[in-house]
Structures are given as C-alpha cells and as structure tokens.
C-alpha cells in the first residue's frame, strides 16, 4: 500500500467486495495511467463469513477468467462448474434416496467455462493483484465517510473519511459506490426503489464435500453402474450448482474447496422466515422437505450461517453524466436463481469502465444515457422470471419450459454480446435495445401463461410416479442459441444479423412453449403440428383459460397443413400425464394442492 495518499484520484471506489475489487482490476488492466483510491469500512478484506454469489454462469465466468485475466488462478484454486441441475421429488415415493428424484439438466460441459467461487478467496486475490500496481491506494477501517458530488462538469467530487482517527480528504473525477447493501449513493441521492420480487434466503457453509449422488443406501458400485447414467452421464453432479425444487423455492448445493455451500431461497408468501432463520431450523426444514439430505446433513459441522429477509431491490439510476455510478449490490440486484449477480457485476463494470475511460464530455453524455437504458433493460428482463413464474419451480415440466426459454434468451442476448465486447459499442446497443424490447413483451406474456399452466396442472393432471430425466437441449431452440458462443470477433453489422437470428429463434421457442401448453391442456399432441393454429397464437397476449383455449383450437382443428418446426415438437410430451378423475380434482382443490 502506498505510504502517502494523493490529494486527487481519477477514481474513488467506495467498498471492496467482489464488484468494487473487480472494477478496480478492470480499470488497472485497461489503463496504466488511472489513479484509484479504494476504501472500505471493514477491518478485514475479505471477511471471515460466507457471502452469496458463489456460482458463476457464462457471462461472469468469461468476465472473471478472460477479461480480468484470472483463468489459471480460477482453475487452480476454485472448482470448474458443471452447469445448473434441477431435481424434483417423485409422487408416491419417500424420496429418501437421491435416485428417486427427477432431473432436468444439460449433460455436457459449457464451452464458455463457469466456476464455483469461494468469494473470500477470489476477493483476496483481486486485492492482492490490485495492490501490485503503484496506481492503486487502498484503505481499510474507513469511517465517517462524506461524499460531496460535483454539481458542474468541470468540478471534481470531494470525498472525506477517517482511518484510526486520521482524516483524509481527496478529490476525484469519478466516484463509484460499490459498498453493497449500505447503499451509500442510493440513499444520498434518493434513488432507492422496491421491486416485485419478495424472496428471502437462508444459507450456510458446512465442512467437507456433500456429494448428492451418495445420498442413498446404494453401494458405490451400484451408484457407478446405475442405469440412470444412460441419461445423465458420468460427470460429477456435485460440481454443478444443484437445485432441489418445490413451488416457489429451491435449495442449493455448491462445492467449495474443503466445504459445501448450502442455501434455501424462498417466496416469502409461502414460507415464514421464522421457520428457517437459524441453522438448526434450516437443517430440520430441508431434511423434512428433501428427505435424502437427512442421510448426511445433520452430521455436518456448520461453519457459518446467514440470511436475507428480502434479497432483491431496484434503483432509480446507476450511472450519471456527472461521473458517478453504482455497481453490484449498491445498485440494482436480482434474485439468486440462475446466479445472475456475477453477470450484473460483469456487465455493469464493463459499462462503467468504458465511461471512465471516455474523456470527451459530449461522448460521455451520449454513452451514459444509453448505458442507463441498457442496465435497466438487462435488469428488468429478470423481474418477470422471479416475480411472475417462480411458482413453476414446483413442477418439472413447467419449470423446464420456463428455463429453456430463459436460457435461450440468455445465450443469445447476454452471453453473445458480452464475449464480443459489444455492450460498449453504441451502434450495437441501439440495435440490441430495439430487439430486446420485443422480447420483453413476449416474456411477460409467456411467464404469466407458464404460471397459470402450473396451477392448472396441479389440479387437473396426475403426478409422475417414476423419475423423469430431461436434457434441456432436447428442446432444439436452446441449441440454436448456444451456437452464438462460436460467433466471435463479429462486426456490428454481423452482430445485428446474429441478433435477428436469435430473435426469430426465441419467437419460435415462445410459439413452441405456448403450443405445448395448449396441447397438454387439450390432451392432444396433434395440436403441436397444426400450422393454422400455431400461427394464430398472439405471443404478446397469451391468456390461460381452458374453455377459451379449446374454442380457439377448435377454429383451426380441421386444418391439415403441418407446422414446419425446426426441432421435434413433441420433445417435452413425455411430461404430459393423464387427467385426474373429477373426484381427484375435487379432493385436490379441497386440500389446496
């Protein structure tokens, strides 16, 4: 750490968590001239306890490994991640054995690698690397913070704080709030906003590796030779972010070196937080709801536990032409399902880095306006997934349809631009936002349709009595989106063509999803091939009403022309079960099932 502080810095970063440390490293890699002061009120970086955000997906995996140049370190000190896997209990079984659970997954590894991160270790490494440069100054124990933001373009911001009784006062061209849920600038600028996501989380570290494949009374040989592997393959399931699902909730298992991260995320309308708000209660709840964990979890030593009563929040603004910005949990934050936190850090830090490196004020003004629109759009697209159709977690079919739709959009509209450095090209961003807005309207409609189907199915369809194994790539639209991983170094015109292809692919997938639900409700797979009917679907105004759906299809039932699908339209048909008898429906409604 430099022995002497400067009076002025190009950038002052408030907070030294994953977002702030990542931004500092990205800036230091981008310029050998920028001076950076980073301060944190805590006395130790990283802290001792657990932090959520341990799993990465493709955007964040690429960002940390390639953009921040940590690839060799990640492979050496952390685990390579084996995708996301999802599990559901099987009706009529006690579900005390892992092999009793249905599974949806991607069998192969991602060509854009992802990682399971020990947050404390990676933050320690980022800080170590930042401190190797003489452009970087770092202060712990920074309290009595005061920020006076500049009111004119040619004025600097003023930041003061004290460390162990010594006051420091500096000026800065840029001030970045990365102080997490302290929301320093959100509160100061009156930017705090709520959103429609009301989910809590209770999570912990336990000692050692909790290997879910051995939550069984089968022998090692029986586990190795289980015929289910003809579907699932041989890669170690424990390397995945594993999700054990029920309506409106999921329980994760994430491997870290020497320990396992476990956590429950839940809709607060369905689970009172008081029932899971300490480690003993959490273990008890999990062993009751997912009985296979009773074989192992009560024997584990809890290393750390924490909780959030309200995980997600919005923010009115996250970047300003007068050279301040909010990143990470200091700004907009979503639900942890799909591990989007690292992605938001990756995208926001990239936009903020580009803004900081922009010297011309007129150019900065244009970029800031566009980047704020982009950040709102990227964040806003997540909200229906969490606020509208979270209940679909309770059914393998409904959730598989939901996840394939969301992952297809993610691959084509999040991963593709990020790995091509396109989010900082204004020509591309304008084109992106135009196309993304069309997807947004369909997304809201489809998420509502999926949720209604889930609730209808609970009442009207028999549950599965044997496990089902489903690879998400069996629905062909996802594979089309994954091919964008290999479209690298494209021009803006070429990128627009890719977006158009991906928009068409997503619309085709939305059409398939709606048609599948119609066919399942009507109990007739012929619905999936009726071109006249399928082309009549209004994807932006899908309405779930069984009688109206029957009448809608009847208008087209006589048509014999098949729809020209590019993949198997019956890919998800094995999820469809017989209808319940009228007495079973009445009993289910009485029981609230």
Please place each PLM-identified region on the residue numbering.
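Beta1/beta-strand and adjacent pyrophosphate-binding region of the FAD-binding site
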Residues: 3-19, 37
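Short beta-strand to alpha-helix junction loop
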Residues: 106-128, 271-277
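FAD/FMN-dependent oxidoreductases across multiple families
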Residues: 241, 247-249, 257, 267-390
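N-terminal FAD cofactor-binding segment of flavoenzymes
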Residues: 46-95
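Conserved Rossmann-like nucleotide-cofactor binding loop
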Residues: 19, 44, 182
């Amino acid at each position: 750490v430099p022995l002497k502080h400067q009076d002025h810095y190009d950038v002052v970063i408030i907070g030294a968590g994953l977002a702030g440390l990542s931004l500092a490293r990205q800036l230091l890699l981008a310029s050998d001239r920028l001076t950076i002061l980073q301060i944190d009120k805590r006395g130790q970086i990283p802290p001792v306890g657990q932090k959520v955000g341990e799993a990465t997906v493709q955007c964040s995996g690429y960002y940390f490994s390639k953009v921040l140049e940590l690839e060799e370190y990640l492979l050496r000190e952390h685990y390579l991640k084996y995708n996301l896997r999802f599990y559901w209990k099987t009706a009529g079984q006690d579900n005390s054995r892992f092999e009793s659970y249905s599974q949806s997954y991607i069998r192969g590894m991602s060509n854009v690698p992802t990682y399971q991160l020990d947050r404390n270790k990676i933050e320690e490494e980022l800080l170590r690397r930042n401190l190797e440069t003489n452009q970087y100054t770092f202060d712990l124990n920074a309290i009595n913070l005061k920020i006076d933001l500049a009111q004119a373009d040619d004025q600097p911001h003023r930041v003061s704080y004290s460390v162990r009784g010594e006051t420091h006062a500096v000026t800065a061209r840029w001030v970045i709030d990365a102080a997490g849920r302290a929301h320093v600038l959100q509160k100061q600028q009156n930017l705090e906003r709520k959103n429609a996501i009301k989910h809590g989380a209770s999570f912990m570290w336990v000692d050692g590796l909790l290997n879910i494949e051995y939550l069984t009374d089968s022998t090692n040989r029986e586990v190795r030779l289980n015929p289910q592997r003809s579907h699932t393959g041989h890669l170690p399931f424990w390397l995945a972010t594993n999700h054990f699902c029920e309506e409106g909730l999921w329980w994760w298992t994430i491997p870290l070196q020497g320990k396992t991260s476990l956590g429950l995320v839940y809709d607060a309308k369905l689970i009172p937080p008081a029932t899971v708000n300490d480690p003993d209660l959490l273990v008890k709840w999990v062993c009751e709801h997912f009985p296979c964990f009773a074989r192992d979890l009560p024997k584990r030593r809890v290393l750390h536990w924490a909780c959030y009563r309200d995980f997600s929040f919005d923010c009115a603004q996250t970047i300003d032409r007068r050279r301040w910005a909010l990143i990470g949990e200091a700004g907009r934050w979503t639900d942890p399902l799909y591990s989007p936190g690292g992605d938001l850090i990756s995208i926001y830090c990239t936009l903020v880095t580009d803004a900081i490196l922009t010297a011309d004020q007129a150019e900065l003004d244009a970029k800031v306006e566009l980047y704020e629109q982009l950040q709102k759009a990227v964040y806003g697209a997540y909200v229906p997934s969490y606020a509208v159709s979270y209940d679909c977690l309770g059914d393998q079919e409904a959730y598989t349809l939901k996840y394939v739709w969301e992952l297809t959009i993610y691959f084509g509209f999040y991963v593709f631009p990020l790995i091509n450095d396109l989010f900082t090209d204004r020509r591309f961003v304008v084109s992106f936002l135009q196309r993304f807005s069309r997807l947004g309207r369909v997304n809201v409609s489809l998420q509502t349709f999926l949720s209604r189907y889930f609730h209808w199915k609970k009442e009207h369809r028999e549950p599965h009595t044997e496990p089902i194994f489903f690879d998400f790539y069996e629905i062909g639209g996802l594979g089309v989106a994954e091919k964008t991983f290999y479209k690298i170094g494209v021009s803006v015109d070429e990128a627009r063509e890719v977006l158009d292809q991906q928009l068409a692919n997503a619309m085709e997938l939305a059409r398939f999803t709606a048609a599948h639900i119609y066919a399942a409700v009507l109990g007739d797979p012929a619905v999936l091939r009726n071109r006249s009917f399928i082309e009549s679907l209004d994807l932006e105004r899908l309405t779930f009403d069984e009688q109206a759906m029957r009448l809608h299809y009847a208008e087209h039932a006589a048509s014999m022309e098949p729809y020209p699908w590019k993949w198997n339209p019956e890919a998800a048909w094995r999820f469809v079960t017989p209808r319940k008898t009228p007495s079973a429906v009445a009993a289910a409604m009485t029981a609230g099932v």
